[in-house]
Curated annotation (Swiss-Prot):
Catalyzes the epimerization of the S- and R-forms of NAD(P)HX, a damaged form of NAD(P)H that is a result of enzymatic or heat-dependent hydration. This is a prerequisite for the S-specific NAD(P)H-hydrate dehydratase to allow the repair of both epimers of NAD(P)HX. Accelerates cholesterol efflux from endothelial cells to high-density lipoprotein (HDL) and thereby regulates angiogenesis. It comes from Canis lupus familiaris. K(+) binds at N120, D185, S221. It is an enzyme of class 5 (isomerase). Undergoes physiological phosphorylation during sperm capacitation, downstream to PKA activation. This is NAD(P)H-hydrate epimerase. The keyword Mitochondrion applies. Binds 1 potassium ion per subunit.
Length: 288
């Protein structure tokens, strides 16, 4: 409880927010099998066994991922908020399959969702809202909020669902390990370029010291979109959106899901994505 008192003493919660102490959950995970590996049984959390993903599933470069997005918006007239809602729901669904509430040590399981300033952060806000509906207790840290109606609305939706927002990031990994059972990395997406600046440099440094598992949305934050990890965070769960990116070939965590079941068949054919068949009405597909 000393760590919790220290955290509360720092005034890390925004007004009206509450945090619960949740014992740490070991997050050191063995390297997962290759994404094209055949179906295999799986025990404990993680939902259904991994499917048989075709070896031809395409891993996109940054340029290809941007081109697909542009066509979705321009040619197919999808709106940003529409795709964000579908992506965020996919992320929450993948998390619920990898870490079912019944497999966690506390009820409801406490989850910290860290959101960046762009669309990846918006996906995280939507994900947090659905996690609340799925039986988790999310808390959001959103240090750089865009002054745009879409993101303001997403924040309001979360607040109306009694999802607390932190005023500051817990400064030590052990505090996060004590308070949460899972951290969702919704900081940077595939369009990120350049050096990581504050406050996100410090945030990623803290995340790198966690023992609780990290679930990264689309790209593990701090990774090069094509080359992969350069000594940054090591997520336990990766949720690729639309199609996997080239950096995902360097992913060694336990769970890799594909989400975002919204790609029109003609667009999939044009870019030769060769996406795997989603089962029944599922919005996610387990690649690993």
């Amino acid at each position: 409880m000393s760590a919790l008192r220290a955290l509360l003493g720092l005034g890390l919660l925004a007004a009206g927010s509450r945090l619960r102490r949740v014992p740490g959950r070991a997050g050191a995970c063995p390297a997962g099998s290759a994404w094209w590996e055949a179906r295999r049984p799986h025990s404990g959390g993680g939902g259904e066994p991994a499917g048989m993903a075709s070896p031809a599933v395409k891993y996109l470069s940054q340029e290809e991922a941007q081109a697909v997005d542009e066509e979705l918006f321009n040619e197919y007239q999808f709106s940003v908020d529409q795709l964000m809602e579908l992506a965020g729901l996919s992320c929450a669904t993948a998390i619920a399959k990898a870490y079912p509430p019944t497999s966690m040590s506390r009820s409801p399981p406490a989850v910290l969702v860290i959101c960046g300033p762009g669309n990846n952060g918006g996906d995280g806000l939507v994900c947090a809202r659905h996690l609340k509906l799925f039986g988790y207790q999310p808390t959001i840290y959103y240090p750089k909020r865009p002054n745009k109606p879409l993101f303001t609305a997403l924040v309001t939706q979360c607040q109306k669902m009694d999802i607390p927002f932190l005023g500051e990031m817990p400064p030590e990994p052990m505090l996060i390990d004590e308070l949460y059972e899972l951290v969702v990395d919704a900081i940077f997406g595939f369009s990120f370029k350049g050096d990581v600046r504050e406050p996100f440099r410090t945030i990623l440094s803290v995340l790198d010291g966690l023992t609780v598992p990290i679930a990264s949305i689309d790209i593990p934050s701090g990774w090069d979109v094509e080359k992969g990890n350069s000594g940054g965070i090591q997520p336990d769960l990766l949720i690729s959106l639309t199609a996997p990116k080239k950096s995902a070939t360097q992913f060694t965590g336990r769970y890799h899901y594909l989400g975002g079941r919204f790609v029109p068949p003609a667009l999939e054919k044009k870019y030769q994505l060769n996406l795997p068949p989603y089962p029944d009405t599922e919005c996610v597909y387990r690649l690993q």
